[in-house]
């Protein structure tokens, strides 16, 4: 079980990205499910289209349709939890996508996250006395 962040997925998808091989390997070797927040999905889809074109976006969305990732549900209570995380870490500029991963970490009781965003995910505490295990950095 792994949570996926925008930077980790983009790095895994595009060979010219920083740490591509490590991110691709971490993603492929992760035991399913690979959990994606709807906010991360929106970011990834936008950036895949921007840098890879509409055909690349269509291919990525087909992966979601084939359930290569589990698209997590997010309701109003989850948004409130994310808002509280954004407020708590406001000096770091943590946004909704990153905060949603912290919310999902609690729900799924996992601390593994595929990301290159060490600045935010080293600071965010997903649970008392718990840290994220950042992949591929901590792998």
Q: What kind of region is each of these model predictions?
A:
Residues 70-116:
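Active-site neighborhoods of divalent-metal-dependent phosphate/nucleic-acid chemistry enzymes
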Residues 30-31, 66-67, 92:
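Structured helix-beta-strand junction loops
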Residues 50-51, 67, 77:
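Ribonuclease/tRNase effector modules and their secretory precursors
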Residues 37-43:
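Short, conserved active-site loops that position catalytic residues or coordinate cofactors/metal ions
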Residues 1-36, 49-62, 127-128, 138-139:
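Short, well-structured N-terminal submotif of metal-dependent ribonuclease cores
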Residues 7-8, 39, 77, 119:
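Alpha-helix/helix-capping structural signal
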Residues 1, 108-139:
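Acidic, PIN/NYN-like endoribonuclease modules and their adjacent C-terminal/linker elements
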């Amino acid at each position: 079980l792994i949570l996926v962040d925008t930077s980790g997925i983009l790095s895994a998808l595009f060979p010219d990205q920083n740490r591509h091989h490590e991110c691709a390997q971490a993603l492929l070797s992760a035991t399913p499910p690979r959990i994606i927040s709807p906010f991360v999905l929106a970011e990834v889809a936008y950036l895949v289209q921007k840098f890879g074109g509409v055909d690349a976006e269509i291919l990525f969305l087909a992966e979601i349709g084939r359930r290569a990732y589990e698209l997590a549900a997010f309701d109003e209570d989850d948004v409130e939890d994310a808002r509280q995380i954004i407020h708590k870490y406001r000096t770091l500029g943590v946004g909704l996508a990153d905060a949603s991963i912290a919310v999902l970490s609690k729900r799924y009781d996992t601390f593994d996250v595929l990301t290159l965003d060490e600045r935010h995910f080293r600071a965010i505490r997903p649970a008392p006395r718990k840290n994220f295990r950042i992949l591929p950095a901590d792998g």
